[in-house]
């Protein structure tokens, strides 16, 4: 376009530079933008068509991808089941039952048996257990064989059991001592019960002398109440009778007394059958012990002294010039024998226990005492 063709704008002067036009440049830039948008839209449409096509193939064959992955990673293996076993042949029909045959008499069967040949092998020696408690002697030989077999089996089992126990196996160590269970119970009517284990305080009325057996008595010094402490059962002043035996031996310092019966001032009587004890509950009654030393050894000592003095006098009268005295020579055998005999007769004298009247003792109740048959409780 020449300058001549450019129209002259109104209001402009000659030689003045005018404003540049933008129409030509603007139209070219618009075409480029439209072309770019067309290309981008075409690409997007192609991508959408490709996605729809792949999704349709996946829906038509959902296992194709998994099959492809498994085929590419793991080789295909075919497992076949073993053939089924052939059918079992049918069972043959059961044969008809045989007719019952009559049982022959034992004697007839024994007669029909052929005799044994002479070259029969010798029987094994059978262990004779006739003296054993397991052997039962009967008239029938069959019973004897059965008893002998049972005895052998029992002996074998016992030997095996003993072998296991002697070996100290773990099985025997895992079994502890078996103890029986005990069942608890309630005391009946404790208002009239003097329970086992109670101790009655008592003062002796009679002197105890263990030279010979004898009877004894004592007086209760303290009231005894029921097991629950509500009812007075044995009043103070009740009399208890008992007995003792002359059983004191060398080295013993107590005597056993059995208290048999108690009688209250109201006339109530009940059997005790309980042992005597000291005030602290120790078994037996202590007392003064006379060991009878001089009675046991006095005669032997006297005879030995007489023998020694006799030998000394014999040596002095004999005129011996020596000042030494030999007490082991000379006669005196008869005197020694007398001393030994006297010692044998007196060495076994038992000691005697003495316990004076008025001393405090105890009685250990060895059983439950029930006073419900003579006492009753009435409300006030």
Swiss-Prot record:
- The Pro residues compositionally biased stretches are 81-100
Q: Where is this region: Disordered?
A: 1-26, 78-102
**What membrane topology does this protein have?**
Single-pass membrane protein
Q: According to the lineage, what is the superkingdom? A: Bacteria
Q: What residue intervals traverse the membrane? A: 33-53
Annotated compartments: Cell membrane
Which cellular components does GO assign to this protein?
Answer: plasma membrane
The answer on whether this UniProt entry bears the keyword 4Fe-4S reads: no
Q: Where this protein primarily resides, as one coarse class? A: membrane
**Keywords, in A-Z order:** Cell membrane, Membrane, Transmembrane, Transmembrane helix, Virulence
Q: Which NCBIfam families match?
A: T4SS_VirB10
What family is this protein classified in? Belongs to the TrbI/VirB10 family.
Instruction: Give the protein name, as stated in the record.
Output: Type IV secretion system protein virB10
What's the source species for this entry? Brucella melitensis biotype 1 (strain ATCC 23456 / CCUG 17765 / NCTC 10094 / 16M)
| Gene name as annotated | virB10
């Amino acid at each position: 376009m020449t300058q001549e063709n450019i129209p002259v704008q109104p209001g402009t002067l000659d030689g003045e530079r005018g404003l540049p036009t933008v129409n030509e440049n603007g139209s070219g830039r618009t075409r480029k933008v439209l072309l770019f948008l067309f290309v981008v839209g075409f690409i997007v449409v192609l991508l959408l068509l490709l996605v729809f096509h792949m999704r349709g193939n996946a829906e038509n064959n959902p296992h194709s991808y998994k099959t492809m992955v498994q085929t590419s990673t793991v080789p295909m293996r075919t497992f076949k089941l073993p053939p089924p076993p052939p059918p079992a042949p049918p069972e043959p029909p059961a044969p008809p039952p045989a007719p019952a045959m009559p049982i022959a008499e034992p004697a007839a069967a024994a007669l029909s048996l052929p005799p044994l040949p002479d070259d029969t092998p010798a029987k094994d020696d059978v262990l004779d257990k006739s003296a054993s408690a397991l052997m039962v002697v009967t008239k029938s030989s069959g019973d004897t064989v059965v008893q002998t077999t049972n005895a052998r089996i029992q002996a074998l089992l016992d030997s095996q059991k003993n072998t296991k126990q002697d070996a100290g196996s773990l099985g025997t160590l895992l079994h502890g001592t078996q103890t029986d269970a005990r069942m608890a119970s309630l005391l009946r009517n404790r208002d009239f019960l003097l329970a086992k284990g109670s101790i009655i305080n008592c003062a002796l009325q009679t002197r105890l002398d263990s030279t010979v057996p004898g009877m004894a008595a004592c007086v209760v010094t303290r009231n005894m109440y029921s097991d629950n402490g509500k009812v007075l059962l044995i009043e103070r002043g009740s009399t208890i009778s008992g007995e003792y035996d002359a059983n004191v031996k060398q080295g013993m310092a107590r005597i056993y007394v059995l208290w048999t019966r108690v009688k209250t001032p109201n006339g109530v009587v009940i059997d005790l059958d309980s042992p005597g004890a000291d005030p602290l509950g120790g078994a037996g009654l202590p007392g003064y012990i006379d060991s009878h030393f001089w009675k046991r050894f006095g005669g032997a000592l006297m005879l030995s002294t007489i023998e020694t003095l006799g030998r000394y006098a014999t040596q002095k009268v004999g005129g011996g010039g020596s000042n030494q005295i030999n007490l082991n020579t000379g006669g005196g055998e008869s005197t020694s024998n007398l001393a030994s005999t006297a010692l044998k007769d007196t060495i076994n004298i038992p000691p005697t226990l003495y316990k004076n009247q008025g001393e405090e003792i105890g009685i250990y109740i060895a059983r439950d005492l029930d006073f419900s048959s003579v006492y009753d409780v009435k409300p006030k």
